[in-house]
């Protein structure tokens, strides 16, 4: 199919392009930016006056819940939610059932994605077998199958020697290791950030040091091994400072933050609403401000949804007995637009943190607009608004933003030149 997108404000953060112009797509590729190629004839024209055309968003943390947790979601439903939020490429974590630690599971996910996915799916493989922190998974074979990085989720590898050897092995093959830095002992049993709010509510706390202690250890071992490292779900201002110091030393380190950590604080749990039960926990306004500053400066180069859909019953128990997580990929772009609305970021910088930044962090082939490249795009109206939940594709409705009026509205999402979201 050939498509012409006319009169859009085309923003490509990777190249610095920001101008009102046209895009022409042919055979799933970008044929031209600006004037149409000689002999080009569009079978479909999208009039895009007042609309921004940008690289499709790249989300580094989307739990697809398949295999093993179909009551919470599946590849079809959660990638449908992803394209509704402007996401064309996503990474799914290894916490499936069975764990994504073998070729069979990786191939199952990728085969299912080819069959049912609306967006492109890039698995993150398990660093250790069963995420148990003892034996390395088949990292090279998993890479060759299609895994873009490797991690152990929130399950810490307790033995320093085991982790050091794992990082050295990964460095040998130029693999990227994803860390979720939370010390198991300091976080054990915790439900909320350890501070005034947790004390007031009588909830067991998870101190900032649960992140910073684990982060410091991991950074030292990264320095020793030279491995490419990505630190996911940074939650504290001090954690962001440690990342900045590592980058100043020249370590090959990148980081992301969950979008909701840039919006919410531990004050949100005041009413014991399980919709705000997340792991790692929401932290203080000071931490939120520190994270925002790190995003603005580029120390944190990626904003992700860290989408975790749940069935209704998973959030109906008392706070401490509920499952943590927020279903949020469907709102990634409009929620992120609140950062522009608040004056924290300009639009090109926001789009960099949502596309080229995350793509570079995990070397995902996405996040840019170039002639001959894949026609993965999001078209959105920055002046319109989205009422969260009016239309909902994810199986998980565990989202505290449902009912909120958010800035910006996704009009079209295209993957390989095919309209996956928007008017057919």
Curated annotation (Swiss-Prot):
CDD domains for the chain: DHOase_IIa
A biological-process GO annotation: pyrimidine nucleotide biosynthetic process
Highest taxon of source: Bacteria
GO cellular component terms, semicolon-separated: cytoplasm
Coiled-coil annotated spans: none
Cross-referenced InterPro entries: Amidohydro-rel (IPR006680), DHOase (IPR004722), DHOase/Allantoinase_Hydrolase (IPR050138), Metal-dep_hydrolase_composite (IPR011059), Metal_Hydrolase (IPR032466)
Keyword Ribonucleoprotein set for record: no
Presence of keyword Endoplasmic reticulum: no
Any Pfam family the entry gives: Amidohydro_1
GO molecular function: allantoinase activity; dihydroorotase activity; metal ion binding
Key words of the record: Pyrimidine biosynthesis
Entry-linked Gene3D superfamilies: Metal-dependent hydrolases (3.20.20.140), Urease, subunit C, domain 1 (2.30.40.10)
Function text: Non-functional DHOase.
Subunit organization: Heterododecamer of 6 active PyrB subunits and 6 non-catalytic PyrC' subunits.
PANTHER family: ALLANTOINASE
Similarity comment text for this entry: Belongs to the metallo-dependent hydrolases superfamily. DHOase family. PyrC' subfamily.
Protein name (database record): Dihydroorotase-like protein
Gene encoding the protein: pyrC'
